Amino acid sequence: MKASRFFIGTLKEAPADAEIVSHKLMVRAGMIRRVAGGIYNYLPVGLRSIRKVEAIVREEMNRAGAIELLMPAVQPAELWQESGRWEQYGPELLRFKDRKQNEFVIGPTHEEVVTDIARNQIKSYRQMPVNFYQIQTKFRDEIRPRFGVMRGREFIMKDAYSFDKDHESLKESYKKMYDAYVRIFTRIGLEFRPVAADNGSIGGSGSHEFHVIADTGEDAIAYCPTSDFAANVEAAEALPLLASRAAPAEAMQKVATPGKAKCEAVAELMGIPLERTIKSIVLATDNEGAEPTVWLLMLRGDHDLNEIKTAKLPGLAGYRFATEAEIVEWFGTPPGYLGPIGTKKPVRVVADRTVANMSDFVVGANEVDYHIAGVNWGRDLPEPVIADIRNVKAGDPSPDGKGVLDICRGIEVGHVFQLGTKYSDAMGATFIDESGKAQPMVMGCYGIGVTRILGAAIEQNFDDKGIIWPEAIAPFEVVLCPMGYDRSDAVREAADKLYADLAAAGIDVILDDRGERPGVMFADWELIGVPHRLVIGERGLKDGKIEYQGRRDAEATLLPADSAATAVAEKVRAALAR
């Protein structure tokens, strides 16, 4: 490729709405341009990197035995109504009517369509296992699209769907996809972690997310530095921080805490650690034709409620936070001084595992400006229902028993789910088993955010000059920067020969023949992030030398002109082989 025949749309400044590094650099490097909120044009530089990501994904999916197909972006409402997600999905599902007033959606995922394919095409257990995948544009009408391709409304995704005869077979299909994802992200050159995760709106039983580690990541990841354990903070099990409950050492007493409605303020006033205070959270579950059931959840003062874990507790599916009027009705006081002792009406108490092992703790007195200290289970309160209802924190014991947890930020770029029979049951996707009986197909689904990978890779790989691409997905592997290409026959001939030799060696090379000043050339290619640069100048050629600099190198080095192509080709191959 010659730069004079390519489109290079670099900018000196990032747009005002670009908040994170990847968004700023993708615009400045001429990779993307905004069309509407969360919708982008992918310019030639950006598209080249997208195609390289897609090629790696496609190779590894094929290697894992998946079969490529292509499903429509536009899907009939009937399929979504059949699965039940027409009502469950929120406004991020873009719905519209055609000229005949038939309802359709633009697909955010394709579980319904692929299940429709399977129920019409797969009849026998002999046709399974099978795994279909596609690389296609999706649309989710995000309420606040931001961060460029990291949270866009339209994006490119690889989604795959496996169909098995039973759950044991699904586990094998799931493992193949898990391993394929590890290979994909390793080949791309990302620092990543697979983490145990919650299935969310997709449904099913087990799942893992694949996160690129980056300070700008939206997700908090709990991991153990001394083991392989990693999980989304929302899914990580929080073990009790006390091995057992100590015997009471204090008498229960009411304490004046004027104006101290927060645990931190109470602890400071009483001169005790925050860890001895209790945070009370009031939830409600509605009962048709009757008053709601009110719940009091008790957490240690320095802990936060995990809403996903809470929703999985018996009786708490579909819970909501109680209104202030309900709190006053059940506790006799507004929020800030709530506790389990002396409630106005009966409430159901759930204590976090750590709280259940505490002694001599402080709770609200259900009276404004008062708390109760020296509270103990069994003596002052009946034994509670105990559950894991909090988020883990750095320093907590790792659930695998092999150390303590640390917390980092991650950008989710892939997710694998064991769906089970959620969709096949709803949509009647059955097959005939070995005994001649109809059984629901057991499904898995597996997604990779192709365009999001670009943003995540940049968040891990940049400096003050621009992008530093992982070798495998750089738009070009090598750039040739001739000094005076249009003025010097020697420079032009040497550059053309280098270009031909590198291209013949299978290297993705671009020759900058635009006639730009050296500073402009260097700034453009450092911004775009090409991993290897060769500078050809008359002075160096007189000494038989060409200047080489890797994008990550602090200084340039000189290479013999007659072997420079071979040397750089070897550097590229070595980097790709890592």
Curated annotation (Swiss-Prot):
InterPro entries registered for this protein in UniProt: aa-tRNA-synt_IIb, aa-tRNA-synth_II, aa-tRNA-synth_II/BPL/LPL, Anticodon-bd, Anticodon-bd_dom_sf, Pro-tRNA-ligase_IIa, Pro-tRNA-synth_IIa_bac-type, Pro-tRNA-Synthase_IIa_type1
Record PROSITE patterns: AA_TRNA_LIGASE_II
Keyword Cytoplasm: yes
Enzyme Commission number(s): 6.1.1.15
Location, primary (coarse class): cytoplasm
Coiled-coil segments on the chain, per record: none
CDD domains attached to this UniProt entry: ProRS-INS (cd04334), ProRS_anticodon_short (cd00861), ProRS_core_prok (cd00779)
UniProt KW keywords: Aminoacyl-tRNA synthetase, ATP-binding, Cytoplasm, Ligase, Nucleotide-binding, Protein biosynthesis
Superkingdom of the organism of origin: Bacteria
Gene Ontology biological process terms, A to Z: prolyl-tRNA aminoacylation
GO MF entry, a single one: proline-tRNA ligase activity
Catalytic activity, as annotated: tRNA(Pro) + L-proline + ATP = L-prolyl-tRNA(Pro) + AMP + diphosphate
UniProt enzyme class: ligase
Domain notes: Consists of three domains: the N-terminal catalytic domain, the editing domain and the C-terminal anticodon-binding domain.
NCBIfam families, sorted: PRK09194.1 (NF006625), proS_fam_II (TIGR00409)
Binding partners and assembly: Homodimer.
Listed HAMAP family: Pro_tRNA_synth_type1
Name of the featured protein: Proline--tRNA ligase
